[in-house]
Amino acid sequence: RVWRDESETQVRSGDRVALEWSNQILRWSNTEENGLLFAGAQTARLLYTKRRVPQVNLYMPSAIVDATGSTRPNFGWIESLMGLHLGKCVLITGGSAGIGGQLGRLLAISGARVMLTARRENQLIDLRDSIVRELEEIGYNRPYERVRILSDIDVADESALVKSVAATLKAFGRIDYLINNAGVAGAEQMAVDLLPEDWRNTLHANLVSNYSLIEKVVPMMKQQGSGYILNVSSYFGGEKYIAVPYPNRSDYAVSKAGQRALVENLARFVGPEIQINAIAPGPVEGQRLKGKDGKAGLFDRRAKLILENKRLNQLHGAVLKALADGATLDAVLGAMCTNDIGLLQSPEVPAALRELCIKLKAEPNGSEEPTYSSMHYLMTRPMATRLIARLRNGCLMPQLIHHDLAEKWILDLPVPPEPFVDPARIEAEAEKIRNGVIGMLHLNRMPTETDVALATVFFMADRAISGETFEPSGGLQQERTITERELFGRAKPERVRRMEGETVWLIGEHMSEPLAAAAKLFLAEGHVGSIVMLTRTAAAGDAIRFALGRALGHDRISYMAVGDALEEGMDTAFQNHGTPAAVVSTPFAPIPRALFGIEGKDHLAAPEFSELIEMNLTHHFRVARKVSLFKGARLILTSPDVPAGGTLAQFAMANFVKTTLHAFTATLGVENERLPTAVPVNQVNLTRRMRSEEPRDAAEQAEEYERYAHAVLLAAAPIVEAQESRYRARIYRGLAITV
């Protein structure tokens, strides 16, 4: 009391600038177990706020629960959450565990009402009960009404998304926050080994579902005057202007890049009422990383896949070399059907295969009696299935043996005992991956799911951010590829001359002018022997033929309308014209003109968004999956074009596709270095990030198409091989050139 009085006197006299305020907490009035913690929490509240309690003596309540309604003291970050999101109604997909579950928990502590949706009811019930108990301890009134659950929700199912929105509206009357957290890990295979249905499933569950829910909540959020949408992406989906290669998970990388690119390009359309952002966690110390329910953890799965793919790539390379040396496919597969490394070292076995088996047998095994079977067996049946698929997609298997003989060969293959891969090597590789990840983290540690959720809850409280991606893992020191590089210069004549007499494939539908410009340049400067134009419809071929006119060499162009049978069309082109020196892939459909009813009454519905993904992303995957198996080919992927006079919605969605596509290009560039075919892949962008830089008239449009043609020729001309220069061979792959 004297201290306080002296401080006030000194402030009045000018001897002290700031007032020192004093209180004392008397603890003798409380004997409960949590009394000291409660006193500490109240002390922190007094010290770190500007509150001035007139009473000098502050007595502890004899019963904390009766006095506060809380069964435990609240201090630290929990106290800082109180009221942060008070009254908000939240829909969280994938809310039964992991980051989604922790977001639900912390938002509920922050005062929000949450609807947690997921597939497994038992996990949802356990989490809900846990959150309710915590809310009761904090002192929330009727906490069981603040946390609702909805099970059997698969975000790949459109009807489940409709059900989720309806259930949230029924429970709370409104939706203030949408958190798109649910998703799948993907097929975890190299792109050439991915099945199209697996690719589509990943993109539908992780990306199309996000847009579908966004489309459903935007009108109601606009009407109520506020809203917040959060996409849970991943650092391996890249960041603004940057693509991060993620080998063996191209479908996942593309879906996560799409989630991020979506918010960057939708923000201007949903504001000012609605904020839309993404978070991009890096590796998180949690259930998915460690594994659960008998499923191996992420690092263990990646380690096993890396080691299996190393063997598969060795086998694939040996088969290609044996065929190049003159062996028949029947002879190679006939030798391999024993699946016995020892037997395959005999002189009558094709040399390339025999040399590989000698090398495998000589590898150190770490023990006299290895407990794994890869020392004696070439491959597992799943590996054999992938090898046959590679030969089939690489157009090395005649149509007659596509199914019957190939399937019989796989079924007749002796099955190696488990484990196939040395568990000690898997463990060592997993540790290597883990240490590599730790070394890339700025914090030199992986955050927990709670760490990520806590940072995100505070991020969501900022009302001045939209269209951005937040990295709650502290960021990664990762190899990165800039998404947009300007086109400067042209292909060197000595490189272009190496294309003389070769075959080029141009694949597309509606982009007749750019394709015609590229064809003219290939004929005039590349002096290619033939061009195969693969279109979806015959009308598109006619449009390209018209755009070409009587260009020099136009008679060296053949046209094929493949419809939706793209792979079969490429097979036919390969059979008729041989291995292409370069393949240029352009989208099979234009970008829609509308989005959220901003321009006109039309809007981009979820099925139309799904079609956009199919024609602009999956289309390129289907091309790349085959062409990456053509030894000697170069692959160029083209992002969509927005014609002069296009809408803002078209421009936004074209940039969305461009950014998302480069996640695939960058990843494929790394993966293809590991394949024996070593096909370089690059991307050419026709859409710029700034709309003011887009062509305004026909003359500027023609200039852009000329630049496009030169960019395509630059990427299509033969580049240096890895054995000549590892450095140059590497930096020329996975790039994106903007024209």
List where the protein language model places each region.
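Conserved Rossmann-fold SDR core element
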Residues: V270-V284, A331, Y377, L387-I388, ...
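Conserved glycine-rich cofactor-binding loop
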Residues: S96-A97, H510-S512
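A short, exposed helix-loop element centered on a Lys and neighboring polar residues
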Residues: I214-E215, E264, A624-R625, A666
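C-terminal substrate-recognition "lid" of short-chain dehydrogenase/reductases
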Residues: K321-A327, A331-G334, T338, L378, ...
